[in-house]
Structure formats: structure tokens, C-alpha cells
């Protein structure tokens, strides 16, 4: 399945971005992980069917209600295998 690496910038920490991203990933069938970065961004590695990935990326450009997304850097990467979508902490 195609895999993408995302860096989401803006007011994206402390607004339930990771938890909501997991919900959206689970709903769309996307697998991978999401984590906060030291720089204050959110980083995501996601795999799924092309249509599901596009829906997930579109959601990432908006985020949860309290988020203010300024930029989503998206790049295709070598296919990765994940069993589910996880929130990575720390």
C-alpha cells in the first residue's frame, strides 16, 4: 500500500490532533503512527489505499476543531507495513 510521511505545522499540539487523527485513520482504514515533535509540529507516517490516504491527508489539512493548520508537508516514501494506527508518545 502507498505510504506517506506528513509534517503538520501550526497550532497542532494540545488540541487533540493525535487522538483525532487516530480516530480518522481507524475510520478510513489508514495504518501507521502519529507523534508530536520537539519543534511543536505533528509527524505522521501513514499507509493505506490511495483513496483512504487522500481522505486522511485532506483531514490533516484541517485537523480537529481547535487546531489551526498552517502547513502540511507531504512526501511519498517507500512502502511501510503497519498493523494498525498508533499514537506514539514521548
Language-model segments: which ranges?
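Intrinsically disordered, low-complexity, mixed-charge
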Residues: 1-90
Amino acid at each position: 500500500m502507498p505510504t506517506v510521511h506528513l509534517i503538520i505545522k501550526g497550532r497542532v499540539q494540545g488540541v487533540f490532533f493525535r487522538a483525532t487523527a487516530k480516530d480518522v485513520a481507524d475510520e478510513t482504514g489508514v495504518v501507521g503512527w502519529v507523534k508530536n515533535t520537539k519543534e511543536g509540529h505533528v509527524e505522521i507516517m501513514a499507509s493505506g489505499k490511495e483513496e483512504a490516504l487522500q481522505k486522511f491527508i485532506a483531514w490533516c489539512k484541517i485537523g480537529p476543531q481547535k487546531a489551526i493548520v498552517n502547513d502540511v508537508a507531504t512526501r511519498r516514501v517507500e512502502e511501510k507495513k503497519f498493523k494498525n494506527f498508533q499514537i506514539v508518545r514521548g
